[in-house]
Amino acid sequence: MYDKKSLKAEEFINDGEILDTLKYADENKDNLALIDKIIDKARLRKGLDHREASVLLACEDSERIAKIYDLAEQIKKDFYGDRIVMFAPLYLSNYCVNGCVYCPYHLKNKHICRKKLTQEEVKSEVIALQDMGHKRLAIEAGEDPVNNPIEYILECIKTIYSINHKNGAIRRVNVNIAATTVENYRKLKDAGIGTYILFQETYNKKSYEELHPTGPKHNYDYHTEAMDRAMQGGIDDVGLGVLFGLELYRYEFAGLIMHAEHLEAVHGVGPHTISVPRIKHADDIDPASFDNGIDDETFAKICALIRISVPYTGMIISTRESKAVREKVIRLGVSQISGASCTSVGGYAEPEEEDENTAQFDVSDNRTLDEVVNWLMSLGYIPSFCTACYREGRTGDRFMSLCKSGQIQNCCHPNALMTLKEYLMDYASEDTRKIGEKLIEKELLKIPNEKVRKITAQHIAEIENGSRDFRF
């Protein structure tokens, strides 16, 4: 039986409820009166439930889809303005005991080069990332209790936070590791992590068990209930995601919205972020061998509907996607992107040799961080390296209340400008700096509070003179 307040995976992600939802959506995909009513509800910026959102996903009326896209763009601006948060992944180890059939880290892959970073190598990687201008990392590691125990992850986090190279600093470490215990989540919380991220991969239990035939990840319930344990362990911010292409996308979409509803119902806080990866080629993995791939237009529609269904969430897209796709979905709802990503273990400090490939997936957007920052500004966006909310305690329900009320912009907009100024001073090319200085000058005038505007302008002048790390 479906119960969004239950702590049992098969009750808050209930297969029967999802199938009934998809049937309801099919029956109403041409019901324009109902569709208009749902779109009108979405205009209130309070979100949609999984049934309402699924009806819009099934809708094929071009006029209504255009309305959905326009609304998604406006809602994104209302909650997040024109800011795009920048981050980079850091792969610590590709040792893994699981048998996931879509991931080259699977245990049976005998020709991938296995690698685990030492603390000295972590330091070298972080310095390389700082020298690009990154302030926010998402650390990744395969599941292996011998090679990658929680103690190793904690040591890496400590090392990352300890490094201050020139004007560089990693100010927020997000963590994407396998489902674990409440005790271990408490340790991650104490280590000062930002968001705990865990992709569900697929919400279809039967498919999940087939795609994860061996290893601890085979346990669907343990994996699906991980976010509840993380929040019980004191982690305020969690990030959801599915790997689109493994199962029917409409099933996955309904499950994703249901998971967000569950977190809100039980913990009073929905997902801090939702990621939208699509399966990509990697080592011995061919995405064409999976039958549920989605085209770019369907992908864009999913992104738009996540934005209007869960309006407060940060939406993340990686360099799995091309420049063209990223440009489209940023407009429709994405608020965080990676730049200059390396999906290998190591690779930032020294590019790896071809015969030592350790990548989890192939990258589609190979531009430098400077090129990505320049491109975003040319589109009218503000690249943000801000980590202030995490460092000022604006996490969990406190962040959500500020975000839902729109008050978060009073902090985020000036913080974005100040961190962009840092980037321009320390890392940008001459062309990027010229574009950025003009953008900051223009955006300063948009800060509505005169006192905040003056303080921001003062801090930007101080950054010009060598000071760093101001925040509201």
What are these regions (language model features)?
Residues 1-37, 324-332, 341-472:
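Radical SAM enzyme core and accessory elements
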Residues 36, 40, 44-84:
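An N-cap/entry alpha-helix motif that binds or orients negatively charged groups
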Residues 80-121:
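Canonical Radical SAM [4Fe-4S] cluster-binding loop centered on the CxxxCxxC motif
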Residues 88, 126, 154-161, 185, ...:
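Generic structural signal for well-ordered alpha-helices
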Residues 107-124, 128-231, 236-246, 268-275, ...:
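Core AdoMet radical
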Residues 141, 195, 221-285, 295-324, ...:
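Conserved C-terminal portion of the radical SAM core fold
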Residues 211-217, 288-292, 358:
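Short glycine-enriched, charge-decorated loop/helix-capping segments at active-site entrances
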